[in-house]
Amino acid sequence: MADITDIKTILYTEKTLGLQEQGVVVIQTSPKMTKNGLKEVLREYFGVTPLRVNSLRMDGKVKRFKGRVGVRNDFKKFYVKLPDGVSLENGEA
């Protein structure tokens, strides 16, 4: 079962702010989160039923630090279409 702790952040970039005008919110989560799990979390904790959820898996970037190679954590991004007049500003519906 998905949990609210699997949601890392709501992304705020130029691209996502443009999408918010169309009612789409971009959420970054742990890789184990599923579409149905995210819908369940949004209904339970925010009281919002999304119209559509699209997901994509992002591999962690390879980065160098002090001569050593490391890898950042993998994550999933979800594009969530919300009903008109509903937003998730500041983590609240």
Swiss-Prot record:
Keywords: Ribonucleoprotein, Ribosomal protein, RNA-binding, rRNA-binding. It comes from the Bacteria. One of its GO terms (cellular component) is ribonucleoprotein complex. The keyword RNA-binding applies. Pfam families: Ribosomal_L23 (PF00276). InterPro entries: Nucleotide-bd_a/b_plait_sf, Ribosomal_uL23-like, Ribosomal_uL23/eL15/eS24_sf. GO terms for molecular function: rRNA binding; structural constituent of ribosome. One of its GO terms (biological process) is translation. Part of the 50S ribosomal subunit. Contacts protein L29, and trigger factor when it is bound to the ribosome. Belongs to the universal ribosomal protein uL23 family. One of the early assembly proteins it binds 23S rRNA. One of the proteins that surrounds the polypeptide exit tunnel on the outside of the ribosome. Forms the main docking site for trigger factor binding to the ribosome. This is Large ribosomal subunit protein uL23. It comes from Campylobacter fetus subsp. fetus (strain 82-40).
